[in-house]
Every structure is written in structure tokens, then in C-alpha cells.
Regions:
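Glycine-rich beta-strand-to-loop/alpha-helix junction loops that act as flexible
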Residues: 17-19, 74-82, 224-226
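Short beta-strand segments
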Residues: 15-16, 74-77, 134, 152-153
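N-terminal small/polar loop signature for handling phosphorylated ligands or for N-terminal nucleophile
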Residues: 32-85, 89-92
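Conserved short beta-strand edge segments in small beta-sheet-based binding/regulatory domains
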Residues: 241-248
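An accessory alpha-helical subdomain
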Residues: 148-241
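Glycine-rich phosphate/diphosphate-binding loop of Rossmann-like nucleotide-binding domains
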Residues: 5-48, 53, 229-232
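Proline/glycine-rich low-complexity loops and linkers
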Residues: 60, 67, 85-173
Length: 248
């Protein structure tokens, strides 16, 4: 069951692993999904990195990010091919033996009982010693977790199907609130006043995002923070500022 510590602020990072992402051959959609998923559970995504399938790079990145944030989610590199080295790299990062996980092996063995259970398929059961399994309802290959590092597949549909289990393993934090104000004004006319408002509300995050709608240029202004009251105070002032700009 998912639990939340409403008084604690929780932060996370995502490490996307794969040459295919860096080359542009495969488009990453996991970041958007995970960002929304985490935010809904009171976990703020603070950093996203995309790195190649290089052992030393993965080890270095995992060790850096797992110490910096409450949670680290890795995606990609746990399949059956020669360049799927994420599980081995995480074993190195934690200085744990890279070996077959008995339960993961048995799940794969049952799944492939009517076909050839070859070495490539067996490889998907290898992970750091003592790792916990992240069960996979879409296929037989499990993900795994070691301490605060959650290792997931790169295929979006499979990753998404596994998050209901991940939810039971994490503790959410203080809820982040947000409000959006849309206005048919370009960012250039708002920027100066928005900067002044941000200085006044240092405990909030103010962002501006341009859009083009019905032949008109506009800006979506998003106010985010932990205090719903402060957000509403900021919104009232923001709307007054925008009204004044539109009249000028």
C-alpha cells in the first residue's frame, strides 16, 4: 500500500540508459510519464540524465545520483542483448555480486517452458545479489531495486505496467500544488514583471510557457509550491499584473 509522509519533501532523479536514445533512433517517453507519476505522489523530479551503454558512465552516474536524491529510477539496458549492461553496472555501483536471482530465473523458466530458454534469456534473471524484484505483469522479465535505486525496462508500456508495484516500495512526500493562468500575451511583455513577482514569492516556482492557439500567441503561467494559500496569493497578484499589461 502506498504511504506518504506529508511533512517531508522527497526528491528523485531519472537515469535514461541507451545509445538508441542518444542517437535519436528511439524517442524517450518515459520521462514525461515518470515525472507526472512522481509528482502525483509528492515526489519532485529534480534531474534527468541520458547516458550511453557504457559501464563506467553508468556506475559513476548511479553512485552520484543515488547519493544526491531520495530515489533514483533507471530505465533501459536490462534486456537479453550484449549491450544490455545496466544490471551488471548497478552491481558494480553497489559493490555486489552479479548473479542469477533465483525467483527471477524461475519466472523466466516457467514463461519459456515451451520454447528455448537460452543464455540470452537467462541473462534477464541476473542482477545484484540481494536485489528485490519489481514484478512485471506485461512479460516475464522482472525489474529490480537495491536500496533507493529502481531499475526498470526502457519499453514504455512495460515500464508503466510495473509502476503499481513500485508504488508499494516508495514513500511519497509533501504534496506539490500548482495553478495555471493563460493569457494572450507574448513572454516578452510579461518577463520583467514575472521576474519581480518571483522575487516576492521566493518559496514558489513561477514558469512561463509560450503557446500558439486560434491564431494568437499566448503564454501559460504556472505557479507551483507546497503552500496552496501562497499559490492563491501569488495568482491574485499575477492576474492583476496581467490585466494592467493588457490595458497598457
Amino acid at each position: 500500500m502506498f504511504t506518504r509522509n506529508k511533512k517531508k519533501r522527497i526528491f528523485a532523479a531519472i537515469l535514461i540508459i541507451g545509445d538508441e536514445i542518444l542517437s535519436g533512433r528511439t524517442q524517450d517517453t518515459n520521462t514525461s510519464f515518470l515525472a507526472k507519476w512522481l509528482n502525483e505522489r509528492g515526489v519532485q523530479l529534480k534531474e534527468v540524465r541520458i547516458i550511453p551503454d557504457k559501464l563506467n558512465t553508468i556506475v559513476h552516474s548511479v553512485n552520484l545520483l543515488r547519493k544526491k536524491y531520495n530515489y533514483l529510477f533507471t530505465t533501459g539496458g536490462i534486456g537479453p542483448t550484449h549491450d544490455d549492461i545496466t544490471a551488471f553496472a548497478i552491481s558494480k555501483a553497489f559493490k555486489k555480486k552479479y548473479e542469477y536471482n533465483k525467483e527471477a530465473y524461475q519466472i523466466l523458466e516457467r514463461h519459456y517452458k515451451d520454447s528455448y530458454f537460452n543464455e540470452a534469456r537467462k541473462k534477464m534473471a541476473k542482477m545484484p545479489r540481494g536485489a528485490g524484484l519489481i514484478y512485471n505483469p506485461s512479460s516475464s522479465a522482472a525489474g529490480f531495486y537495491v536500496k533507493n535505486v529502481f531499475t526498470l525496462p526502457g519499453v514504455p508500456s512495460i515500464l508503466q505496467s510495473m509502476m503499481s508495484f513500485v508504488e508499494q516500495l516508495i514513500i511519497g512526500g509533501e504534496k506539490v500544488y500548482s495553478v495555471t493562468v493563460q493569457v494572450h500575451l507574448p513572454e516578452s511583455k510579461i518577463g520583467k514583471d514575472l521576474g519581480k513577482l518571483q522575487k516576492k514569492f521566493k518559496d514558489l516556482s513561477l514558469g512561463s510557457y509560450p503557446f500558439f492557439q486560434s491564431g494568437k500567441i499566448g503564454t501559460a503561467l504556472v505557479v507551483r509550491g507546497y503552500s496552496e494559500k501562497r499559490i492563491q496569493e501569488c495568482k491574485i497578484i499575477l492576474e492583476k499584473i496581467l490585466k494592467k499589461i493588457k490595458k497598457s
